């Protein structure tokens, strides 16, 4: 039985030649189909307002992923909320922190990033203990947060 097609569960890359599957498919004479199998849908503005959370009451946002950044700024745009320049951000990793450049001007004193673990996030929270935090998470999140 010879394999002639491979399904990759990712969106098609913009430059196909830079894909790791390009060289493999050329070498083995295979067809590669790209199809994103996972679709992330953000919470609606109505659902967010039902939680009675005021974004502007918080001084620091904690982001765990790029999708939470997209959802946060989408909700702010839909609710016509202007995020103040004084807002600080704590991100899981440096890659997530750099993704914030899509929405804000990147300044090191406003953006902090952890090493990807819960303990490194706690260190950043303790460092900024006078701030009021808002944690943005995706719904099925890995529960490394302690119950409070």
Question: What label would you give each PLM region?
Answer:
Residues 1-148:
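Conserved beta-alpha
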């Amino acid at each position: 039985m010879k394999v002639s097609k491979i399904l990759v569960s990712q969106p098609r890359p913009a430059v196909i030649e830079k894909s790791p599957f390009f060289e493999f498919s050329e070498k083995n004479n295979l067809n590669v189909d790209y199809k994103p199998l996972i679709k992330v849908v953000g919470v609606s503005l109505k659902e967010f307002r039902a939680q009675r959370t005021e974004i502007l009451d918080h001084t620091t946002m904690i982001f765990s992923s790029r999708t939470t950044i997209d959802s946060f700024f989408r909700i702010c745009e839909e609710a016509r909320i202007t995020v103040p320049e004084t807002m600080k951000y704590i991100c899981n990793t440096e890659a997530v922190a750099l993704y914030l450049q899509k929405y804000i001007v990147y300044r090191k004193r406003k953006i902090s990033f952890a090493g990807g673990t819960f303990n490194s996030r706690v260190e950043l929270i303790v460092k900024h203990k006078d701030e009021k935090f808002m944690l943005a998470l995706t719904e099925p999140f890995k529960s490394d947060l302690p119950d409070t």
